């Protein structure tokens, strides 16, 4: 019995508190309506409050107040959006200085007129293909073929020895492209040529590339004309002297060849 009485008391307290809150909200809403509408006779604060609490049948006073409250909420939402836009504009002006102040409206207008979604960007190629038929495809294929041909020429550098590398290499072209791309094809050679070149490079460096060629002397003669001819006649030994020198110094001849005659 005591437990039921306790539950009833708790229920009455909760109902009373809710009634007080509802009464306070109704009084506040009706007072706000009376303040906004001014001295209109059809709005009576007391009647509006009683109608809101349900003590009187709903009449014109509470209905007019509800409409006014809805309009007020809409205005508050719009004011909040304007305030947010103003804050964004102020932040952009603070970040970018006078640039946004000068060109911001123009950029915003252009974005509204020509704004494109990512799906529209992806569909741009399809639209071109539909409008121009196979023309765009041919241009794309020709550009791709030209790029592949140029890459192949740069990779091989026009050197016929590259075919030797392709014959001696056990890897397939697909594996080569996957591993090195087109870079290593132009610089790797056969095993014999690599050993010979590395030995000369290790021993003489870049010096032999300039003067170790048989035609290097002819190049100088063509470049300097009769001056080099007179120089060779005056200072350089003849072939007979060079042969005698080679016989006297076989080690030098073996090591440096005909280069030491000069």
From Swiss-Prot:
| Entry's family note | Belongs to the opioid neuropeptide precursor family.
Give the signal sequence positions.
Answer: 1-24
What is the disulfide pattern of this chain?
Answer: 26-48, 30-52, 33-65
Pfam families from the UniProt entry: Opiods_neuropep
Query: Which PANTHER family does the entry link to?
Result: PROENKEPHALIN (PTHR11438), PROENKEPHALIN-A (PTHR11438:SF3)
List the subcellular locations.
Answer: Secreted
> Which residues are removed as the propeptide when the protein matures?
110-131, 139-177, 190-201, 211-221, 229-253
Cite the entry's keywords alphabetically. Cleavage on pair of basic residues, Disulfide bond, Endorphin, Neuropeptide, Opioid peptide, Secreted, Signal
Q: What is this protein called?
A: Proenkephalin-A-A
